[in-house]
Structure formats: structure tokens, C-alpha cells
């Protein structure tokens, strides 16, 4: 995707974060069992090929593994205008009780006051505002939900746009510990965990702490500006329990499972607020304050998530890791394989 270009002499600061990702490397379905996914171990300065089931052997007693316990909503809902025309709403985030930010397709004709019905003819939502797009982002539509049951009863789980296959088992796009329905996308690093991994971690003396960050669809978008600082990072709601934060602060090493956990913990460290909205845009030369190790999937080129990973590692290290992944048949993106990284290595 071409970045925004405001002049012939503008330097594309995202060019160093571009790489060729063949379509066949993008995993279209989850692997079974979950913990059989590959795990690229880049701790200690070397690269070795392991599997997720091995992660307990790569950690130490006293490490604290932090996971995001958010649950993906069945957020894609087909509704109908009074005229009978269909509208697909993708519920992104509940901004306040009963008020949701959504994506609507098609959005044309959804003026303030427009009412949309469920498939049984009952009033489901009412449009109360529109947020016009910036760059080429879709129009956001703010709706009041009249019938809260419509999401659970008639919705389906949305998948990232690069996954074209149909998911036969929707539970495979949920972590096994998901319990807080609030997200439009899964915290994908956590998809690799199953009871085998959790049991192995427990036997090793590695405890697990849970935080929540509501994952939005903007997490999948590449950066479209030439200058890194010009990118407007998406904001997401997070929450960390006080006792959980005390455990994190006291841990010998903090192992973040996924970039959503990184954003959560580093936001709390920066702001001192255990609950709020994170607008933290992590890129070099950001100095990490909490996270010591990071387990994460392979991310799309030119994305804020790739910049986060770059800032976590020694300069240029991410490319060596990604080239190894591409050359050794690792599966990329949401349903793909994972890597374990050590800060500064």
C-alpha cells in the first residue's frame, strides 16, 4: 500500500519496515493443536526453531506471563432499513452504555435518526452520528443499540481482511482464557495457548496474570503516512487490576503475550492509570519500562505493530528474524506461528 505523499522530496520513513510477504505465507486457518505452532526463539541473541509447547522450557521460574483476556464479540451483524435494504454493521467499540462505534456497509443513506431492524423485524439500532473518514478509512457510524441481544443472537465473529477462508469453528478465533467480551479482533499471540501449555507453565513455576485491552480492527492497518510521527495511532480501552499490577511490578521478568499486553503495561507505567484508553505509539527510540520478553506473531509490513517489535529489539534485528521465518516456512499473521523475543537482543 502506497503511503501518503505530500511532495516529491518527502522521505518515506516506513520504507525500512517494508518486506515482501507472499500470499501463500499468510495462514488461512489455525493449526491443530494450538500449541503445535512453530515458535521462533530469538532470546539470547541466537535464533532457533521450536514449538509453542516448548515455551515453558524457554522461561524461568519466577517469570510472570501476562495475557489479554478479552473476548472477540460476534460483532458482524446484518440489519435492515425500513425500505428492506440490507446493511452490515461491524460493532467496533462501546463508547458508553448502549452507544457503539460501528463500520457500516453500505454507509450511504445512514443519516442521523435512521433506524435499522433485525431479521425478525424488531428495532435493533438507531443512527445518532457519522464520523467521516480520514485518508481512505471507512466511515464510522455511531449507533444507539435498542436491542442489546442482537449482537449475540445474530452476529458472527469478524476475521481480519487478509483471511479469506471460512472458519469452521469460531472458538478457534478466541483464546482459551477469554472471558471479557469487548473486542473486534483477537489478541492473536494468545491463540497458541492450550491446556497442555498452561499445565507445562504451571509445573515450571511460571505464573500467569490477566489484563484486558479491547482490540480494534485498526490494529490490522498499515501506516499510510511517510513520517512515522504523523501517524495517528488507534486508541483502545484497557484495564489492569490493582493486585495484578502489584504482581507485575514485583515480578523478576515480565513476559508479555502479544502486542496488546505490551501497550497495556507500558501505558500504565507511563500514565499511572490502571484503566483508561491507550494511545501509546511505540517506536524507536522508545525505552521499555515493564516488558522483558515478548511473545508475538509475525506482523504485516509497514505496521505500527512491526515498529513496536523493532523498538523492543536491537536495531535491524527484526528483519533478520522475519527473513528466517520466511525462509523456514513459518506461517504469518493472525493464524500464523509465533516468536519469543528478549528486550534489546
Q: Predicted regions span which residues?
A:
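Surface-exposed, charge/polar-rich loops and edge strands
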Residues: 2-345
Amino acid at each position: 500500500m502506497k503511503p501518503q505523499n505530500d511532495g516529491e522530496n518527502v522521505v518515506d520513513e516506513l520504507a525500512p519496515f517494508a518486506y515482501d510477504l507472499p500470499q501463500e505465507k499468510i495462514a488461512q486457518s489455525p493449526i491443530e493443536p494450538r500449541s503445535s505452532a512453530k515458535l521462533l526463539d530469538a532470546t539470547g541473541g541466537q535464533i532457533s526453531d521450536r514449538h509453542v509447547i516448548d515455551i515453558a522450557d524457554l522461561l524461568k521460574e519466577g517469570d510472570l506471563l501476562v495475557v489479554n483476556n478479552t473476548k472477540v464479540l460476534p460483532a458482524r451483524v446484518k440489519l435492515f432499513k425500513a425500505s428492506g435494504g440490507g446493511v452490515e454493521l461491524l460493532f467496533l467499540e462501546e463508547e458508553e452504555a448502549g452507544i457503539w462505534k460501528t463500520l457500516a456497509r453500505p454507509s450511504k443513506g445512514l443519516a442521523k435518526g435512521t433506524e435499522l431492524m433485525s431479521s425478525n423485524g424488531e428495532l435493533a439500532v438507531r443512527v445518532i452520528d457519522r464520523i467521516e473518514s480520514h485518508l481512505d478509512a471507512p466511515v464510522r457510524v455511531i449507533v444507539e443499540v435498542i436491542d442489546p441481544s442482537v449482537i449475540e443472537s445474530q452476529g458472527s465473529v469478524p476475521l481480519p481482511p487478509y483471511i479469506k477462508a471460512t472458519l469452521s469453528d469460531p472458538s478457534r478465533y478466541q483464546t482459551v482464557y477469554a472471558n471479557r467480551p469487548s473486542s473486534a479482533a483477537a489478541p492473536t499471540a494468545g491463540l497458541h495457548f492450550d491446556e497442555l501449555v498452561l499445565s507445562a507453565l504451571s509445573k515450571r513455576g511460571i505464573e500467569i496474570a490477566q489484563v484486558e485491552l479491547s482490540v480494534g480492527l485498526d490494529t490490522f492497518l498499515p501506516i499510510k503516512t511517510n513520517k512515522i510521527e504523523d501517524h495517528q495511532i488507534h486508541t483502545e480501552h484497557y484495564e489492569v487490576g490493582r493486585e495484578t499490577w502489584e504482581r507485575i511490578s514485583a515480578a523478576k521478568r515480565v513476559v508479555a503475550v502479544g502486542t496488546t499486553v505490551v501497550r497495556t503495561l507500558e501505558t500504565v507505567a507511563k500514565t499511572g492509570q490502571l484503566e483508561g484508553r491507550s494511545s501509546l505509539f511505540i517506536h524507536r527510540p522508545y525505552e521499555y519500562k515493564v516488558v522483558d520478553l515478548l511473545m508475538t506473531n509475525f506482523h504485516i509490513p509497514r505496521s505500527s505493530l512491526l515498529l513496536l517489535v523493532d523498538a523492543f529489539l536491537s536495531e535491524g534485528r527484526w528483519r533478520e528474524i522475519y527473513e528466517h521465518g520466511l525462509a523456514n516456512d513459518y506461517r504469518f499473521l493472525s493464524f500464523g506461528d509465533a516468536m519469543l523475543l528478549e528486550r534489546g537482543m
